[in-house]
Amino acid sequence: MIKDIVVNLTIGVERDAAANYAVSLASIFKAHLVGVAFVYDPKVSANLIVGIPAELIEAQRAATKHLANEAVARFEELAKQAGVMTESQMIDVTPGHVGDTFGRLARSFDLSVIRQAEPNKAEQEVPIIEGALFESGRSVIVVPYVQTQGAKFNCVMVGWDGSRAAARAIGDAMPVLERAKMIEIFTVVAGPTKNTELPGIDIGQHLSRHGLKVEVKRIPAEGINVPEAILSHAADISADFMVMGGYGHSRLREYVLGGATRGILASMTLPTLMSN
């Protein structure tokens, strides 16, 4: 059951793909929705910035707060039009702590929704996604920044590699899978294999015991990178949602995204639920 959702509201944009998607998701599941807009406060680290007048720092903060207010207003209007119960929060934070802050906040919700970072822009979505994935203990749906449609589950792709993260993602995604019209479990084969057994059969049988109709397929990825192979296949079958484990590794006591996960997040074409 999905009863409450938290969405990171993107500031400084006219159309927030994450907010739009989260509102539609909350409407489908009759879930309570909380929108969070961060106000980035440079005053905390002002002692590290030599020679910048305090007035300029305060002006930067005021500008960020204005953008956060606008994001909240747009979100509340979207929710009102959809008849979704919501509340909004604005949280002061320094850029270096935004991921941890959102991760701790997301622990109290069934899942979080975050917009994909736009390429070549210095945005905070990546640390927020990392915080949600590695600090919250909950699943996160990342929405492409170009997404215009609301939540749909006509064709759901489910990534399977036998890992703990993949199993966790499938468990977290059950409310979505139960609404899916078509479910395809896919495994990626990066090169030639003599293994005649189709990976994913066991997890497919598990889902079938829940009354779900699934197909199991291999995605060949010889000669191309794994994210490219996955997203190409998603386009071929007109998938509108994907479920996968979110992978990372520890570095200096922090978790950072693994290569395949980072590749999907950089080039994603469909909303994707990730769990770790």
Residue ranges of model-derived segments:
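Amphipathic coiled-coil/heptad-repeat helices and related helical stalk/stem segments
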Residues: 18, 98, 125-126, 166-169, ...
